[in-house]
């Protein structure tokens, strides 16, 4: 007879916990808390987390990372000015700021460079990385000039007719002699 009462008490307790405790109406279920990138913890949250609501278990809180912590975990930074064309937007931070992360591929291409496949083309030099194994390649002035049949000179000669076909460096033109069409 005593076992019957114990069985009823255990079943009643399980039913009470699974249906939520009185006074926790409007609280998050564990699934709802997880959907908000949170977790149900007993009373306190882990460091760098904040309570974003109550869970439907008595004494449990729905804890989630702060917007700054979420942004930092995605290797982004919170900026008040918003994201640029070369950034990936990871959503809002506190105070109207945006979580932005520089996209290496967009950044490389935005500045007129190309992403190489394993290595840079002959007339380019690596200046960074688009993705692992794919360098960001910039045209190298002297190498590019040479590949086009030109020479880097302080001044293009006036005696032999030449065209300026590019720039090797600041103030140093890439000169190529004009071909006679004979």
Swiss-Prot record:
GO molecular function per UniProt: CCR6 chemokine receptor binding; chemoattractant activity; toxin activity
Xref: InterPro entries: Defensin_beta-like (IPR001855)
Pfam families for this protein: Defensin_beta
Gene Ontology BP, a term: cell chemotaxis
Subcellular location: Secreted
C(6)C(4)C(9)C(6)CC repeats: 27-64, 65-101, 102-138, 139-176
Alphabetic keyword roster: Repeat, Secreted, Signal, Toxin
Top-rank taxon, per record: Eukaryota
Signal peptide start and end residues: 1-26
Tissue expression remark: Expressed by the mandibular venom gland.
A GO CC term assigned to this protein in UniProt: extracellular space
Record-stated family: Belongs to the beta-defensin family. Helofensin subfamily.
Function as written in the Swiss-Prot or TrEMBL entry: Lethal toxin which possesses an inhibitory effect on direct electrical stimulation of the isolated hemi-diaphragm of mice. Neither hemorrhagic nor hemolytic activities are detected. Phospholipase A2 activity, proteolytic activity and arginine esterolytic activity are absent.
Listed PANTHER family: BETA-DEFENSIN, BETA-DEFENSIN 103
Protein name stated in the entry: Helofensin-3
């Amino acid at each position: 007879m005593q076992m019957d009462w114990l069985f009823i008490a255990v079943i009643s307790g399980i039913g009470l916990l699974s249906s939520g405790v009185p006074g926790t109406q409007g609280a998050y279920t564990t699934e709802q808390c997880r959907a908000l990138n949170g977790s149900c913890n007993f009373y306190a949250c882990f460091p760098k987390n904040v309570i974003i609501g109550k869970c439907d278990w008595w004494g449990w809180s729905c804890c989630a990372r702060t917007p700054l912590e979420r942004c930092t975990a995605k290797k982004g930074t919170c900026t008040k000015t918003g994201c640029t064309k070369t950034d990936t937007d990871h959503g809002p931070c506190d105070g109207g700021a945006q979580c932005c992360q520089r996209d290496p591929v967009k950044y490389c291409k935005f500045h007129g460079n190309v992403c190489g496949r394993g290595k840079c083309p002959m007339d380019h030099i690596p200046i960074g990385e688009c993705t692992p194994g794919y360098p960001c390649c910039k045209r190298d002035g002297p190498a590019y000039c040479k590949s086009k049949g030109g020479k880097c000179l302080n001044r293009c000669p006036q005696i032999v007719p030449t065209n300026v076909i590019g720039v090797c460096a600041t103030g140093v033109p890439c000169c190529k002699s004009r071909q006679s069409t004979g």
